[in-house]
A protein has these predicted regions:
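AMP-dependent adenylate-forming
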Residues: 4, 27-51
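Conserved AMP-binding/adenylate-forming
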Residues: 45, 49-50, 63-109
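Flexible, low-complexity linker/hinge segments
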Residues: 13-22, 156-177
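Conserved structural elements of the adenylate-forming
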Residues: 57-63, 193-214, 219-223
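Structural core segment of the AMP-binding/adenylate-forming
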Residues: 69-70, 97-160, 167-170
């Protein structure tokens, strides 16, 4: 294969992307309606988990209702500090569905770096894995305005709300802020990069076209979410 093969193939992609969804939550709900029993997520390991589209959408919907009932409002920021897990993905989609801005934080960062990102992003609530308790304990007292919620498993999230009411995510627009990704900060403090729902959906469609994904494709995620 020639070294410039990927560049040549990339230049063939049409960038006239037509979006059929109003936001990321709209994408999830419509795909769950179209493919309720199709496999959506597999989390291998000691606590092996699998979700169909409908199962995942149900948990996301329940968790979204909890986030709203807890007092969080559209455009509020929430930080997520997890290793790759179903809990991270449920909270990620749930937050986006109700118009929150997600601030994912690499759990391998130091307590000082985590504290800086929470403060800089003005995150109101911080969800974190119970495996990170010792790291979070070091910064809790100095972040008195933030609410910390430890999450052990997907069952914790399901138990947060028992409502079956379907969430209406129509109040979230394509141009609303969706995620703030912080850089590694190799030459200083990490810098936040803002992505909208439009950015996320356009990226997803571009990647899907680039790799020629089909309904039968499976993607292996190794890097931190």
């Amino acid at each position: 294969m020639k070294s410039n093969y990927l560049i040549q193939e990339h230049q063939k992609i049409s960038y006239q992307i037509k979006l059929d969804y109003n936001n990321v939550g709209d994408l999830l709900f419509k795909k769950a309606e179209e493919n309720p029993n199709k496999k959506f997520l597999i989390c291998p390991g000691e606590n092996h988990e699998e979700f169909t589209y409908l199962e995942f959408e149900t948990v996301v919907n329940q968790t979204s209702q909890f986030l709203i009932k807890s007092g969080l409002k559209k455009n509020d920021k929430i930080s997520l500090i997890f290793h790759n897990s179903s809990e991270f993905l449920v909270l990620y989609f749930a937050g986006l569905c109700c118009g929150l801005t997600i601030v994912p934080i690499n759990p391998e960062m130091s307590s000082r770096e985590i504290k800086y990102i929470i403060e800089d992003s003005n995150s109101k609530t911080i969800f974190y894995s119970d495996t990170l308790e010792s790291k979070i304990t070091k910064i809790k007292d100095s972040l008195s305005d933030a609410h910390f919620k430890k999450t052990k498993s997907i069952k914790d999230l399901i138990s947060l709300s028992d409502t079956r009411k379907k969430l209406d995510c129509n109040q979230v627009s394509l141009h609303d802020m969706a995620v703030i990704i912080y850089t590694s900060g190799t030459t200083g403090n990490p810098k936040g990069v803002i992505l909208s729902h439009l950015n996320l959906l356009s990226d997803a469609m571009g990647i899907s076209e680039w790799f020629q994904f089909t309904q039968d494709s499976r993607c292996l995620c190794i890097l931190p979410l």
